[in-house]
Amino acid sequence: LLVLELADLAEVGFDLDMTGFTATEIERLLDLVEDGDVAGGDPEPVSRAAEAANDESADADADAIHNGEEDRGDDYDPASTIASVSRAGDVWIIGRHRLICGDAGDPAVVAALMRGETAHLCITSPPYARQRDYASGIGDWDALMRGVFAAAEDALRDDAQLLVNLGLVHDDNEMQPYWDAWIAWMRARGWRRFGWYVWDQGPGLPGDWRGRLAPSFEFVFHFNRHNRKANKTVPCKFAGQDIHLRADGSSTALRGRDGGALAWSHEHQPTQDMRIPDSVIRIMRHKGKLGRDIDHPAVFPVALPTFVIEAYSDAGEVVYEPFGGSGTTLIACERTGRICRAVEIAAEYVDVAIERIRQQLPGLSITLEATGEPFDSVAAERRDGARVAA
C-alpha cells in the first residue's frame, strides 16, 4: 500500500522528498511500481488449454515481462463486490451486437459467437503486461496471442484488416520487443506487417521514469492479407474555401477565371473535403482511479476504436473484438453504425461491459440468447440461486 500511495503522489507531482524517505529509498519503492511487483495486474490467461501446464513457467514469465510505461495495477476487482451474473458460454444479445463469455482462443467459442458471420475488421487491445489479475496464473503471452489469432481466422474475412494496440515494456533497463515472435508467427500464417502506427496519448505521465522521457504513446500494429483503402474521415483544412495560402504567405485562387474549381490546389493535391487519417493517432488516454473513474485496468478511450472503425470499415459491417474488456469496442460500433462481435474470458468483465453499455447506450436491449431473458431477470435468478446455495 505504501508503494501505491507513493506512486499516486508522484503522479500528481508531489515532492516525495517531503515524505521523509531518502532519494534512494524512494527510487527503490517506485521501481517496484514500474516492475509490476505491487498488487494488481497479470496479463490475460493463456489460451488456454495449456494454462495448467504452463502455471509453473508462468511465474518466471511474469518476471520477464513487465509494464514499464505506467502503473496500470490496482487492487480493484469487480467480482470482489458482488457475484458475477455472467457465466462461461453465455451469449448476450445487445441490440444487434453479440458478446460471449468465453475463451477467444477456443474455436468453439468463436463459432458460437459468429454463427457463420465473418468480420471486415478486427480492432483490439490485448493485455501485454501486468494489467489484469485473474488469480489463475499469467500464462505465456506468445501462446495467448497465437491461440487467439489462430481462432480469429475463422471469424475474419480473407480481406479483413486486423489492428492491434500494444504498448512498450521495459525489463532490466531495456525496452523489450516482446511482440517479435508473435509477429513472426503472424507472417508465417500469411498476415502482412502492413502498417505500424503511433497512438499519441497526450502529455506524458508525471514521475521519474529511470531517466527515460515520460511515456505518452503506444503502438497500433496493422496486419492484412489484402489492401483496403482507408476511408477519408478527416476534414481538409481548406475545404470549401476559394483561396489558399502559399508557403510564402501569399494567396492563390482555387477557381479558374470561368469560376470552376481547379483540379489541383495546395502542393499539387486535388481539392477535397476529407482526407485519410494520419499514422499518428492523437487521442487522449483515459485518466482516473480504477474502481472509481474507470472499470478496467487497461481501458482505452472509445475514440481509439472509433478512429480505426471509421477508417477501415463501413456502416453495417461486422467488427470482431477478441479481448472485449469493458465493452469499449462494442460501444464504438454502436455509435458508428457497425455490428460488433466480442469475446471476453472473465465473467466479471462481461458484467462490467454490460453495465457500462447500459449507462452509455440506455436504448439497447440486452438479453441472454439461450433463454431470451433480459439481463436484470437473469441477474435476479442467478443471485437468488447463489444465496440459496450458500
Predicted regions and their residues:
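Non-catalytic, charged low-complexity extensions flanking SF2 helicase motor domains
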Residues: 29-32, 370, 382
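Core catalytic lobe of class I
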Residues: 1-351, 390
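Short, conserved SAM-binding/catalytic segment
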Residues: 92-95, 354-368
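Conserved SAM/SAH-binding loop
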Residues: 104-107, 370-374
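Generic detector of low-complexity/intrinsically disordered segments
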Residues: 18, 264, 363-366, 370
